[in-house]
Amino acid sequence: VVEYLNDNYSELKWAVAARNQEKIDAVKAELSCDVPAILLDSTKMEDIEKALSLTNLILTTVGPYQIYGNDILMMCAKHGVDYVDLCGEPGWMFEMQKHLATAKESGARIVHSCGFDSIPSDLGVMLLQKIAKERFGKPVEQVKCRVRSMKGEFSGGTAASLRATLGKL
């Protein structure tokens, strides 16, 4: 996400956040990324409050959300800050509906699962639309996608989300 924003949206005002400064510094150095950095430990309310005071949107890619996402989502809903994640934890998302009225009242928009298992297809559609515009002068109106086979493994975050979910059963 950081690499994509850095490479494609230089005019956008954004910052990178992480739980420890070393990780932030490493990512910024690796990508030659010159954006502000925010130290944000989602278990510390003061870190969340500070981050929310600096932004209009939190985009979080750090799960398990049922461990690291509760307070961030709750505070976004309370303070009118938009929230986007790539969560694949349906039980947690259902539980977070308790903040819906607060989010509506404050104007916060809550978007779950934006990118969860869809990044390959989203990128495919983006490239298809780019080619369609180049060849036909307009994007296609509808795209259908099917998966015949998959190779890959669970990421560390996916495995942690599974453990956290099973721990609640």
Question: How should each PLM-predicted stretch be described?
Answer:
Residues 1-9:
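N-terminal Rossmann NAD(P)H-binding glycine-rich loop of SDR-like oxidoreductase domains
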Residues 10-23:
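Conserved glycine-rich Rossmann-like NAD(P)H-binding loop of the short-chain dehydrogenase/reductase
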Residues 27-34:
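Short, conserved SAM-binding/catalytic segment
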Residues 38-68:
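Conserved Rossmann-fold cofactor-binding substructure of NAD(P)-dependent oxidoreductases
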Residues 64, 74-93:
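ADP-ribose/adenylate-binding Rossmann-like module
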Residues 86-108:
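Rossmann-fold NAD(P)-binding glycine/threonine-rich loop
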Residues 111-117, 121-169:
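Conserved anion/nucleotide-ligand pocket segment
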